[in-house]
């Protein structure tokens, strides 16, 4: 199955050496958002709404949005469908990363990952520590790559989603960010 990688606004593979990168338009990525919750609805899903608002305001495209119960198999099924879709570049989940019995997002997503992005969880918890102090140790936020698709698993709180997007994801999902970003790596994620 062919994977469609983002290109620059002129339809060519993204350049990492062009001095005019920041003058170019953002390369819009297709981002799917999954809210993991037994109780949220479209009307009450503030964290999912925040992520959609932030990603579209930045210039990215919403590929799909879903609210999925706290069930590892349902989470895994939706994530697997998106991972298999070459038009979905990024998956962001919100919810289910805590320590309670129903929190199973890491258990659902981890087996699907080809590689983990350890730095994401580490930096996210460091940023969260500045806001919520030692409560940040309860977060099991994680990120990784599966079939060339980036997956970011965030806590369910709106504040955590805001921190993750504003402080990490917005820059790393912009190919103009230097010295490096995750988008530049996308064409090489399938190398063997």
Across the structure, where does each feature detected by a protein language model lie?
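Non-catalytic beta/alpha edge segments that cap or flank active sites
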Residues: 2-192
């Amino acid at each position: 199955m062919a994977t469609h990688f983002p290109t620059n606004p002129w339809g060519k593979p993204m350049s990492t050496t062009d001095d005019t990168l920041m003058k170019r338009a953002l390369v819009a990525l297709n981002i799917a958002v999954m809210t993991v919750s037994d109780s949220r609805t479209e009307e009450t899903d503030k964290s999912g709404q925040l992520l959609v608002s932030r990603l579209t305001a930045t210039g990215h495209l919403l590929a799909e949005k879903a609210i999925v119960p706290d069930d590892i198999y349902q989470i895994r099924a939706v994530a697997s469908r998106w991972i298999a879709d070459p038009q979905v570049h990024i998956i962001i989940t919100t919810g289910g990363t805590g320590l309670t019995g129903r929190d199973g997002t890491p258990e659902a997503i981890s087996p699907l990952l080809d590689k983990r992005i350890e730095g994401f969880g580490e930096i996210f918890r460091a940023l969260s520590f500045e806001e919520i102090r030692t409560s940040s140790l309860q977060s099991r936020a994680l990120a990784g790559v599966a079939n060339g698709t980036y997956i970011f698993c965030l806590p369910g709180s709106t504040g955590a989603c805001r921190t993750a997007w504003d402080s990490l994801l917005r820059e790393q999902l912009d190919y103009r960010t230097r010295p490096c970003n995750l988008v530049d790596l996308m064409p090489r994620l399938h190398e063997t």
